[in-house]
Amino acid sequence: MPKPPLWFRHIGLHSSIRLSAALPLPLQFTWLIPLYGFSGMLLSLPWATGWIKRNGPRPAAYLNLLVTLLAVIHGSVVIRMVSELGPQHLEFPWLEVADLRLRIGFDLSLSNLAALELVTTMSLVCQVFALGYLDKEWSLARFYALVGFFEGAMSGVVLSSNLFISYFLLEMLTLSTYLLVGFWYAQPLVVTAARDAFLTKRVGDVLLLMGVVGLSAKAGSMEFTDLYSWAAHALESGAIGPLGACLLGLGLIAGPMGKCAQFPMHLWLDEAMEGPNPASILRNSVVVTCGAIVLLKLMPVLVLSPLAIQVLLAVGSISAIGGALVALAQVDLKRAFSYSTTSYLGLVFIAIALQKPGIALLFLFAHGLARALQFMSVGSIIATTTCQDLTELGGLGSRMPATALAFLVGSAGLVGLLPLGCFWCYGLIVHTLLPASPGFVAVFLITNLLTAANVVRVFRSVFLGPVMPKTRRAPEVIWLMALPMVSLAVIVLLLPWIMQRIDPVPGIAAFPLPVALAVAGSGLAGVLTGCLLPQDQFWSRSSQSSLRVVQDLLAYDFYTPVIYRATIVRLVAGMATATRWFDLTVVKGLVDGIGRLSLVTAEGLKLSVSGQLQSYVLTLIVAIVMLLAVLQWIRVGI
């Protein structure tokens, strides 16, 4: 069997196959790790449904925390064993009917297991944080059941070795996103946001399904290793043509675009901010990571179409710079960073399209940890002030020092500033792309600058600005919220040391001094820009029409929702109206017309009834003669 491309095997996503009977028990039972999350969901159901009402909903939270902790411990043991034994592959038969053989497989590589640990660890700290954030929430058990469902689906996505199973789990992520965004379903705006998020992601899922079905028909297998072998010789052998490869690639790209909130399917992440903040932590840190990992696994297939790669680069570039610009104009605290998530995932898309999977994974891990910490600090602000409007916040630095420090560490971890994690990611990608792709180097540096400016202007407004009425009596958060923030801040600070220790990508610290200066300079330029922005004038609309147009353009997301309503929504509404008219006028009219014709004919025939048998026989004979004459005429004509 041909080996996958060297660049793909380098990061360990291709696993050697060993007999599971020869493996240690923790490795043999790795398939249990996704089930920990699902079991937490099932254990929470008695409290979530109200079957058990004694002692409140907290036992459901404790049970979820326990099974998630077991998942973290089990994953840690497995990743240690895999580092010693090498990559493994577990496979179990699922369904065998005639020639149909469906298998459930798990690729146990270091990169997959590192992503698994990121998912389970983020779920654990998020659940601890939620105990404080949702302390008075009457439906706490329902929230933990949904988080368990979320965790199980994400764990399965990162371990799955089968594209069909990955698609099935991505659909579960779409469902869980809908349920978590609509958690406070009594609010009309929340219901609308949940519906829009679900429908937007469904568009990507349907296109992905078309790609999955087409790929299955062409390759004959859904196992990633089989797909890599097929893709290695697909064009040369004529198994697929350029047009087919292009359509296949575009379909496979659409699903991760929706999951990672990339242009033009990015609106759902902004609207998903209507959900509880602990759910926003998971969505902005690890849910988007799962979508990018699926795209990463599909890259050996996507490279069959140069046009698909160009589309991926265009989508990533537009999302990176566009998301960073839109984030600068937001006054909602959570939305300012949700657009920044879109921006960072755009950079990951560029790295994947340029076949730099190791750097893409580093970006995902560094972004996931720092973004989770940033959203935790945002949640602390919302919990103590019940406000997320930047124009109504200020002076929290002296009142919430732990939260301010966590926000500062998380925000700095997202910017290319020495010595935090993203600095090394930026330096490595800039050094790698500079000789052949200087245009994309500019995209990375501009995004770094805009991100730094955004986090600094938010920090100034929330923590350094004048004290506002809603922040005058704001206390520091309770220990259940402070503990995960402090723990995650320590991990973010230690991330550069961890990266140097494990050396995930050769040459991670070997880029030259000019590259380091360019990355650090773009970050410092962004910090300086954020410091110099006049806050009072920044929030108000300018009296100059030209500047006001730019402000509105960014604040309203380049009018993307308006464009959607004027084009796609209007087109679908017009098609629905035309279909309704056709159904009522043509289809229903034809059926009703036949019925009316039958009634009129019956009324006419009723008048011709004479009761004389001879006239009936004569009518029958004439009809038969006419029918035979017509048939004879047709036969002669033919």
State the predicted function of each range.
Residues 72-76, 371, 449-455, 522-542:
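Hydrophobic alpha-helical membrane-embedded segments
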Residues 56-69, 195-205, 398-406, 475-487, ...:
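Alpha-helical transmembrane segments and their helix-start/interface "positive-inside/aromatic belt" motifs
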Residues 41-45, 324-326, 454, 458, ...:
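Alpha-helical transmembrane segments
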Residues 471-527:
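Hard-cation-handling environments
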Residues 3-31, 35, 43-145, 220-242, ...:
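Transmembrane helix-loop-helix hairpins at membrane boundaries of multipass inner-membrane proteins
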Residues 111-114, 125-166, 175-477, 491-498:
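Hydrophobic transmembrane alpha-helices and their helix-loop junctions in integral membrane proteins
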Residues 65-80, 204-214, 410-414, 486-497, ...:
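Hydrophobic alpha-helical membrane-insertion segments
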Residues 505-510, 539-638:
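Aromatic-capped, Gly/Pro-kinked transmembrane alpha-helices
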